[in-house]
Amino acid sequence: MDFFISLFSDPVGFWNSHTLLISQIGINGILATSMFLVLYSGQLSLAAPGFMAIGAYVSVLMDLYWHTPYVLNVVVAVLLAGVVGFLVGLPVLRLRGVFLAIATIGFVEALRLGVILNLPITGEGLGLKNPNADPLGGVPVILVSLVVIAFLVWRLTKGRLGNAWSAIRQDEIASLSQGIFVARYKMVAFVLSALLAGYAGALDAHLNFFVDQGSYDVARSVQILTFAVLGGTGFVLGPIVGATIVTLLPYVFQGIGDYINVISGIFLIAVIVFRPQGIVGRGGLALVRPSWWPRARAVSAPQTG
């Protein structure tokens, strides 16, 4: 309750005292949009934490060892995440559904256990210190980035690319028969998703004085997927709303300790039961109604002439 009182009674004070929370909402919103892209194109990929780790570690390492400008660090980190996304996508995008999910989880764990935990340059299991972090200075960049990314992705879904993704999601075989280059369009979605996850990782790393491999594991994959399931994948704002809710829950109910996990689970189950398409439908926010509740049938206009 104190959380909402502070929000509405003193917005400026709330902003100043919850800067890290606002930043995390923005980061999670970008990750949720990354997940939206692959789900919208019919791919159950859980690779986002791997690309996020690439963005985080590359940007911080460039800053530590080469002292290059922040913008250059982020650009290089994002591009490298995209290149790795393309290379990973070549074999794994031949898979579908659960098999694709398992393969991308394998990529995340292979990167974390096989690379990050075994290279001295990444701090091995001890993590990586980031003395040049700026926890308070990145909020405007993060929020503006989220708005711009959401708008651009929304525009993509309304164009030729979005139509192809939608067709592939509904019926991949039928899409092939219609002349749609399924492999190409799936790769585009996968690489764009990798770029966004890498960007989120680079932004997130420069908010923290310590980069830890534990932030890029399978649990993070499940969390990002939860953003999409909770908010809905029919509209780009859905996963962002889901990310906002999941990020806020621990702060809103911080006085109840470990029971927050129980409340979060109950809330997620309730949404799945009463709003299986997510909080945000294809056309935006809608009334919560059980999936079995009768819906009014559309009445067609009488034909004339």
Region annotations inferred by a language model:
Residues 1-305:
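Transmembrane alpha-helices and adjacent helix-loop boundaries
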